[in-house]
């Protein structure tokens, strides 16, 4: 049988929660607002499928470029190029630096 290459393939451990973090995230995380120029980390929340960027961007740091509806446009460096990804606030964490 041919191997499946879906959107969430090879993410067995990447999209896994620890037992104490299981369930839905706090509502304030979904209502978080960012402004242009904010530095954010892309940390995927597997309990929310909407607005989830591709798993290869998990753990990357980027800059907010614009807001698109409820989502944000984040510029992330991937190899030697900059790529713009669209992600909801549930999958973003504010950078402390």
UniProtKB/Swiss-Prot annotation:
GO terms of molecular function: structural constituent of ribosome
GO cellular component term of the entry, any: ribosome
Signal sequence residues: none
Superkingdom of the source species: Archaea
InterPro entries (alphabetical): Ribosomal_eL21, Ribosomal_eL21_arc, Ribosomal_eL21_CS, Ribosomal_eL21_sf, Translation_prot_SH3-like_sf
Gene3D superfamilies named in the record: Ribosomal protein L21
One record GO biological process: translation
Keyword tags: Ribonucleoprotein, Ribosomal protein
Disordered: annotated segments: 1-26
Biased composition (Basic residues): 9-21
Cited PANTHER family: 60S RIBOSOMAL PROTEIN L21
Protein family per UniProt: Belongs to the eukaryotic ribosomal protein eL21 family.
Protein name, as recorded: Large ribosomal subunit protein eL21
Species of origin: Methanococcus maripaludis (strain C5 / ATCC BAA-1333)
Annotated gene: rpl21e
């Amino acid at each position: 049988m041919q191997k499946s290459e879906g959107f969430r393939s090879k993410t067995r451990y990447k999209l896994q929660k620890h037992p104490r973090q299981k369930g839905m995230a706090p509502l304030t995380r979904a209502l978080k607002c960012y402004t242009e120029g904010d530095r954010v980390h892309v940390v995927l929340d597997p309990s929310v499928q909407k607005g989830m960027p591709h798993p290869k961007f998990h753990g990357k740091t980027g800059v907010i470029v614009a807001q698109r509806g409820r989502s944000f446009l984040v510029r992330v460096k991937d190899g030697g190029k900059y790529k713009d990804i669209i992600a909801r606030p549930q999958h973003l964490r504010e950078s402390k630096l």
